[in-house]
Protein backbone atom coordinates (compact mmCIF):
# COMPACT_ATOMS: atom_id res chain seq x y z
CA UNK A 1 0.00 0.00 0.00
CA UNK A 2 1.21 3.46 -0.73
CA UNK A 3 -0.22 6.58 0.79
CA UNK A 4 1.01 9.67 -1.00
CA UNK A 5 -0.45 11.45 -4.01
CA UNK A 6 1.43 14.15 -5.87
CA UNK A 7 -0.26 14.77 -9.21
CA UNK A 8 1.26 17.59 -11.27
CA UNK A 9 -1.01 19.01 -13.95
CA UNK A 10 -0.73 21.44 -16.82
CA UNK A 11 -1.94 24.97 -16.17
CA UNK A 12 -2.81 28.01 -18.23
CA UNK A 13 -1.37 30.33 -15.58
CA UNK A 14 2.26 31.26 -15.03
CA UNK A 15 2.50 29.24 -11.82
CA UNK A 16 0.33 26.50 -10.39
CA UNK A 17 0.25 26.37 -6.59
CA UNK A 18 -0.74 22.87 -5.55
CA UNK A 19 -1.35 21.44 -2.10
CA UNK A 20 -0.97 17.65 -1.85
CA UNK A 21 -1.67 15.38 1.11
CA UNK A 22 -0.48 11.84 1.71
CA UNK A 23 -2.43 9.24 3.62
CA UNK A 24 -1.93 7.64 6.98
CA UNK A 25 -5.19 7.03 8.83
CA UNK A 26 -5.32 8.98 12.08
CA UNK A 27 -2.07 10.70 11.07
CA UNK A 28 -4.24 12.93 8.92
CA UNK A 29 -4.39 15.01 12.10
CA UNK A 30 -0.59 15.34 11.94
CA UNK A 31 -0.97 16.75 8.43
CA UNK A 32 -3.35 19.44 9.64
CA UNK A 33 -0.88 20.41 12.37
CA UNK A 34 1.91 20.60 9.81
CA UNK A 35 -0.19 22.68 7.41
CA UNK A 36 -1.19 25.08 10.19
CA UNK A 37 2.48 25.78 10.91
CA UNK A 38 3.39 26.06 7.22
CA UNK A 39 0.64 28.60 6.62
CA UNK A 40 1.87 30.67 9.57
CA UNK A 41 5.30 30.79 7.96
CA UNK A 42 4.05 31.50 4.43
CA UNK A 43 0.39 32.27 3.84
CA UNK A 44 -0.20 30.80 0.38
CA UNK A 45 -3.28 30.55 -1.78
CA UNK A 46 -3.56 27.27 -3.67
CA UNK A 47 -5.09 26.53 -7.06
CA UNK A 48 -5.41 22.78 -6.62
CA UNK A 49 -5.65 20.19 -3.84
CA UNK A 50 -4.84 16.48 -4.21
CA UNK A 51 -5.07 13.64 -1.72
CA UNK A 52 -5.04 9.91 -1.15
CA UNK A 53 -6.47 8.01 1.83
CA UNK A 54 -6.54 10.29 4.90
CA UNK A 55 -5.11 12.94 2.61
CA UNK A 56 -8.26 12.66 0.50
CA UNK A 57 -10.34 13.55 3.56
CA UNK A 58 -8.16 16.56 4.32
CA UNK A 59 -8.15 17.77 0.71
CA UNK A 60 -11.90 17.31 0.32
CA UNK A 61 -12.68 19.05 3.60
CA UNK A 62 -10.46 22.06 2.92
CA UNK A 63 -11.87 22.49 -0.60
CA UNK A 64 -15.04 24.00 0.89
CA UNK A 65 -13.20 27.04 2.26
CA UNK A 66 -12.14 30.16 0.34
CA UNK A 67 -9.95 31.00 3.36
CA UNK A 68 -7.72 27.98 3.94
CA UNK A 69 -6.84 29.16 7.45
CA UNK A 70 -10.51 28.99 8.41
CA UNK A 71 -10.60 25.50 6.94
CA UNK A 72 -7.56 24.47 8.98
CA UNK A 73 -9.19 25.83 12.13
CA UNK A 74 -12.35 23.81 11.47
CA UNK A 75 -10.33 20.72 10.55
CA UNK A 76 -8.59 20.98 13.92
CA UNK A 77 -11.97 21.04 15.66
CA UNK A 78 -13.05 18.03 13.64
CA UNK A 79 -10.00 15.95 14.59
CA UNK A 80 -10.43 16.93 18.24
CA UNK A 81 -13.97 15.55 18.17
CA UNK A 82 -13.33 12.36 16.19
CA UNK A 83 -13.09 9.07 18.07
CA UNK A 84 -12.53 5.51 16.90
CA UNK A 85 -16.24 4.71 17.15
CA UNK A 86 -16.92 7.44 14.55
CA UNK A 87 -14.57 5.77 12.03
CA UNK A 88 -14.99 2.02 12.39
CA UNK A 89 -16.54 -0.85 14.31
CA UNK A 90 -15.93 -4.59 14.50
CA UNK A 91 -19.57 -5.53 13.92
CA UNK A 92 -21.30 -6.33 11.72
CA UNK A 93 -18.65 -8.55 10.15
CA UNK A 94 -17.95 -7.80 6.48
CA UNK A 95 -16.27 -11.08 5.53
CA UNK A 96 -13.54 -9.18 3.65
CA UNK A 97 -12.06 -6.98 6.38
CA UNK A 98 -11.41 -6.95 10.10
CA UNK A 99 -13.26 -3.66 10.58
CA UNK A 100 -16.54 -2.20 9.36
CA UNK A 101 -16.40 1.37 7.99
CA UNK A 102 -20.11 2.19 8.24
CA UNK A 103 -19.41 4.67 11.08
CA UNK A 104 -17.06 6.56 8.74
CA UNK A 105 -19.81 6.80 6.14
CA UNK A 106 -22.13 8.34 8.73
CA UNK A 107 -19.43 10.73 9.94
CA UNK A 108 -18.57 11.93 6.42
CA UNK A 109 -22.23 12.30 5.45
CA UNK A 110 -22.89 14.44 8.51
CA UNK A 111 -19.73 16.48 7.90
CA UNK A 112 -20.52 17.28 4.27
CA UNK A 113 -24.20 17.99 4.91
CA UNK A 114 -23.18 20.70 7.37
CA UNK A 115 -21.12 22.58 4.77
CA UNK A 116 -22.74 25.92 3.83
CA UNK A 117 -21.58 25.77 0.21
CA UNK A 118 -20.14 23.56 -2.51
CA UNK A 119 -16.37 23.03 -2.88
CA UNK A 120 -14.52 26.16 -3.98
CA UNK A 121 -11.09 24.73 -4.84
CA UNK A 122 -10.44 22.16 -7.58
CA UNK A 123 -9.63 18.89 -5.78
CA UNK A 124 -8.44 15.52 -7.08
CA UNK A 125 -8.75 12.27 -5.14
CA UNK A 126 -7.19 8.92 -6.04
CA UNK A 127 -8.45 5.40 -5.35
CA UNK A 128 -7.32 1.95 -6.49
CA UNK A 129 -9.70 0.26 -8.93
CA UNK A 130 -9.85 -3.41 -7.90
CA UNK A 131 -11.28 -4.39 -11.30
CA UNK A 132 -8.68 -2.74 -13.53
CA UNK A 133 -5.78 -2.69 -11.07
CA UNK A 134 -5.22 0.98 -11.89
CA UNK A 135 -5.22 4.16 -9.83
CA UNK A 136 -8.28 6.21 -10.82
CA UNK A 137 -8.31 9.96 -10.21
CA UNK A 138 -11.61 11.79 -9.70
CA UNK A 139 -12.54 15.43 -9.39
CA UNK A 140 -14.13 15.76 -5.96
CA UNK A 141 -16.28 18.79 -6.76
CA UNK A 142 -17.90 17.04 -9.75
CA UNK A 143 -19.55 14.42 -7.52
CA UNK A 144 -22.98 14.71 -5.91
CA UNK A 145 -23.17 14.56 -2.12
CA UNK A 146 -23.55 10.78 -1.92
CA UNK A 147 -20.69 10.15 -4.32
CA UNK A 148 -18.43 12.65 -2.55
CA UNK A 149 -18.74 10.43 0.53
CA UNK A 150 -18.19 7.24 -1.48
CA UNK A 151 -15.14 8.71 -3.23
CA UNK A 152 -13.56 9.66 0.10
CA UNK A 153 -14.32 6.21 1.51
CA UNK A 154 -12.92 4.53 -1.61
CA UNK A 155 -9.61 6.29 -1.12
CA UNK A 156 -9.54 5.32 2.58
CA UNK A 157 -10.46 1.63 2.30
CA UNK A 158 -7.20 0.02 3.46
CA UNK A 159 -7.35 -3.57 2.11
CA UNK A 160 -7.91 -6.15 4.80
CA UNK A 161 -8.63 -3.51 7.42
CA UNK A 162 -11.64 -1.78 5.81
CA UNK A 163 -14.00 -3.24 3.18
CA UNK A 164 -13.73 -2.15 -0.47
CA UNK A 165 -16.23 0.45 -1.67
CA UNK A 166 -18.59 0.35 -4.66
CA UNK A 167 -18.35 3.68 -6.49
CA UNK A 168 -19.07 4.66 -10.10
CA UNK A 169 -19.90 1.03 -10.96
CA UNK A 170 -16.41 -0.01 -9.89
CA UNK A 171 -14.92 -1.54 -6.75
CA UNK A 172 -12.30 0.55 -4.98
CA UNK A 173 -9.73 0.24 -2.22
CA UNK A 174 -7.32 2.68 -0.62
CA UNK A 175 -5.55 4.82 -3.24
CA UNK A 176 -2.28 4.06 -1.54
CA UNK A 177 -2.53 0.40 -2.51
CA UNK A 178 -0.97 1.30 -5.86
CA UNK A 179 0.54 4.71 -5.37
CA UNK A 180 2.10 6.15 -2.28
CA UNK A 181 3.95 8.81 -4.20
CA UNK A 182 2.63 9.13 -7.74
CA UNK A 183 4.45 11.87 -9.58
CA UNK A 184 3.20 12.55 -13.09
CA UNK A 185 4.58 15.71 -14.61
CA UNK A 186 2.91 17.27 -17.63
CA UNK A 187 4.61 20.57 -18.26
CA UNK A 188 3.32 23.42 -20.41
CA UNK A 189 5.93 26.12 -19.81
CA UNK A 190 4.43 27.01 -16.44
CA UNK A 191 6.16 26.87 -13.06
CA UNK A 192 4.83 24.12 -10.79
CA UNK A 193 4.91 24.93 -7.08
CA UNK A 194 3.94 21.91 -4.99
CA UNK A 195 3.42 21.99 -1.24
CA UNK A 196 3.45 18.37 -0.10
CA UNK A 197 2.19 17.57 3.41
CA UNK A 198 2.94 14.13 4.85
CA UNK A 199 3.54 12.66 8.31
CA UNK A 200 6.22 10.37 6.92
CA UNK A 201 9.97 10.66 6.78
CA UNK A 202 11.12 7.05 6.97
CA UNK A 203 9.82 3.91 8.61
CA UNK A 204 9.55 4.10 12.38
CA UNK A 205 11.30 1.22 14.17
CA UNK A 206 8.55 -0.56 16.05
CA UNK A 207 9.03 -3.69 18.16
CA UNK A 208 5.58 -3.52 19.72
CA UNK A 209 4.07 -6.99 20.07
CA UNK A 210 1.70 -8.06 17.29
CA UNK A 211 -1.24 -9.71 19.03
CA UNK A 212 -4.02 -9.76 16.44
CA UNK A 213 -4.78 -9.80 12.72
CA UNK A 214 -5.64 -6.10 13.01
CA UNK A 215 -2.17 -5.40 14.45
CA UNK A 216 -0.53 -7.41 11.67
CA UNK A 217 -2.41 -5.63 8.89
CA UNK A 218 -1.68 -2.25 10.44
CA UNK A 219 2.05 -3.02 10.74
CA UNK A 220 2.19 -4.28 7.15
CA UNK A 221 0.49 -1.13 5.90
CA UNK A 222 3.00 1.05 7.75
CA UNK A 223 5.99 -0.85 6.32
CA UNK A 224 4.76 -0.78 2.73
CA UNK A 225 3.67 2.86 2.75
CA UNK A 226 7.13 3.91 3.87
CA UNK A 227 9.27 1.63 1.71
CA UNK A 228 7.50 0.71 -1.53
CA UNK A 229 9.04 2.68 -4.40
CA UNK A 230 10.02 6.27 -3.70
CA UNK A 231 9.51 8.42 -6.81
CA UNK A 232 10.54 11.52 -4.87
CA UNK A 233 14.04 10.09 -4.62
CA UNK A 234 14.17 9.70 -8.40
CA UNK A 235 13.06 13.23 -9.28
CA UNK A 236 15.25 14.73 -11.98
CA UNK A 237 17.00 17.59 -10.17
CA UNK A 238 20.02 18.03 -12.44
CA UNK A 239 18.98 20.93 -14.66
CA UNK A 240 19.79 24.58 -15.19
CA UNK A 241 16.20 25.71 -15.75
CA UNK A 242 13.72 23.89 -13.47
CA UNK A 243 10.05 23.66 -14.41
CA UNK A 244 9.00 23.71 -10.79
CA UNK A 245 9.66 22.71 -7.22
CA UNK A 246 8.18 20.48 -4.56
CA UNK A 247 8.37 21.52 -0.93
CA UNK A 248 7.89 18.52 1.32
CA UNK A 249 6.83 19.13 4.92
CA UNK A 250 6.86 16.24 7.38
CA UNK A 251 7.76 15.27 10.94
CA UNK A 252 10.74 13.16 12.14
CA UNK A 253 9.94 9.48 12.43
CA UNK A 254 10.71 9.24 16.13
CA UNK A 255 7.99 11.71 17.19
CA UNK A 256 5.31 9.28 15.97
CA UNK A 257 6.76 6.25 17.72
CA UNK A 258 4.06 4.62 19.82
CA UNK A 259 1.19 6.07 17.80
CA UNK A 260 -1.10 3.97 15.61
CA UNK A 261 -2.72 4.94 12.30
CA UNK A 262 -5.96 3.32 13.51
CA UNK A 263 -6.16 5.18 16.81
CA UNK A 264 -8.29 8.27 16.21
CA UNK A 265 -8.71 9.02 19.92
CA UNK A 266 -5.55 11.14 20.12
CA UNK A 267 -6.38 13.93 17.68
CA UNK A 268 -5.13 16.75 19.88
CA UNK A 269 -1.76 15.07 20.48
CA UNK A 270 -1.30 14.31 16.78
CA UNK A 271 -2.14 17.87 15.69
CA UNK A 272 0.41 19.22 18.17
CA UNK A 273 3.04 16.74 16.97
CA UNK A 274 2.57 18.01 13.44
CA UNK A 275 2.61 21.67 14.44
CA UNK A 276 5.65 21.49 16.71
CA UNK A 277 7.94 19.22 14.66
CA UNK A 278 7.82 20.42 11.05
CA UNK A 279 10.78 19.53 8.83
CA UNK A 280 11.16 20.93 5.30
CA UNK A 281 12.88 19.55 2.22
CA UNK A 282 12.90 21.21 -1.20
CA UNK A 283 13.10 19.30 -4.47
CA UNK A 284 13.71 20.81 -7.90
CA UNK A 285 11.57 19.45 -10.74
CA UNK A 286 13.19 19.34 -14.17
Predicted regions and their residues:
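Sec-dependent signal peptide recognition
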Residues: 1-7
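Patatin-like phospholipase
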Residues: 7-52, 60-286
Amino acid sequence: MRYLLILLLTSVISALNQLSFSGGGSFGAVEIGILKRVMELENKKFDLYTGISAGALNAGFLSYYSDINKGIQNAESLYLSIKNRMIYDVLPLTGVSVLNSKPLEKTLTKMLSSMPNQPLVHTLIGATNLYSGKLDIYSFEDQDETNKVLLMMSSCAIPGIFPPIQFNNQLYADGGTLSNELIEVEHDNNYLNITFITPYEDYIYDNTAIKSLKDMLCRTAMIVMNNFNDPIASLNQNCKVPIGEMNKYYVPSDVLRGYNILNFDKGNELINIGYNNVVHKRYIIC
